[in-house]
Amino acid sequence: MISMKKYDVVIIGAGPAGSYAAYMLAKSKINVLVIDKYSFPRYKPCAGGLTAKAFNSFDFPISKEVKYSTNSIVTSYKNQIFHNISGNKTLVKMIERKEFDDFLIKKAVDSGATFLDGMKVTEITWENAEFSIKTDSEFFRCNYLIGADGTNGIVNRTFNIVERDLYGFAVEINCPVSRDNIGKFNMTFDFGTVPNGYLWIFPKDEYVCVGAYTTNRKMKNIQKYLLDYIEKLGLVPESEKLKGHIIPYYGINYKQPDFPCVLVGDAAGFGEYWTGEGIYYAVKSGTIAAEVISSSIKSGIFDRQALQRRYQREIIRGLKLAYYIGKFFYGNLPLSFNLVMSYLPVGIMYESASRGLTFDQSFSKIHVALSSLILNKSHISNNKYHR
């Protein structure tokens, strides 16, 4: 008879969602195992921008992992009409996912979690109120399972919790830049060039991450848009191979099943349609999953309704609003760009973003943003120019 070590919770995937859930559970003295098929540290394609709502989500300092911070943003339409929007509050902190993810899983391990990397899960079954997990080398059992294994993860493929029918796509490449010249590059979003999406520049410490994002998953030539943009910028990619990844939106339809298997982050489809942001929703969903599971372990009953309520209130509601705003924005360029880049919307968005508000919170607390804007507390400027 094969012996299987049992844990209270097993988490498949050690990205921000899985690692932070493990950290929260381990802090609560819950016996948790994290399994990832890759050996850490590992490369992870991601622009690596932490918005204020993302970097405010951690209950430990992350300053040592930050490559670059900015209180300004440049937006453009077809790389011609530019708006340089700045103020006195931090909007985004840049990280490198390879290092950041390794940092997060180490925080979980330091708190008491067990981590097995370089181990692939090959089969999962749910029987007699527990999960059996088969890997390429071992077997494990648990009462609660968290799927943090991305858009094509085995957890959702096994249990079909949410249909993977809404998603976009992004490609990126790092371009080396000397420390002396990194200040010449701003965090930039160019709309109108890539259909239903944007081009981006995210400065780090000794390189810039340049990428292209589209909400149209069927687009075939997104790589060409990116390479043309890099050439116009006068940059040289660090390699010839572009890295691509899916941006999921299908989490707006997430419904938690009765049995205690919870999806988090990209596995749950928690990505933002308009901006493509994902790290905040990864950490937020990991936090919610950990808190509900901790409470459920104490009570002895999985509280599915509590998890669904919190997902709905704290994640899905904002994602749905971002989805419809994004649909309007990309479907009505350049009118929508000019509208959004006018003084009042820019000011409200700056105040909301710097306060770490989600889309739905931005609307419910618009009076706070307006008050700060009228008093010019953030010293916001919106300089328009042409190239």
Curated annotation (Swiss-Prot):
GO MF terms, alphabetically ordered: FAD binding; oxidoreductase activity, acting on the CH-CH group of donors, NAD or NADP as acceptor
Signal sequence coordinates: none
Coiled-coil regions listed: none
InterPro entries noted in UniProt: FAD-bd, FAD/NAD-bd_sf, Geranylgeranyl_Rdtase_fam, Geranylgeranyl_reductase, GGR_cat
Pfam families documented for this protein: FAD_binding_3, GGR_cat
Domain of life (superkingdom): Archaea
Family the UniProt entry places it in: Belongs to the geranylgeranyl reductase family. ChlP subfamily.
The name this protein goes by in its record: Uncharacterized protein Mbar_A1602
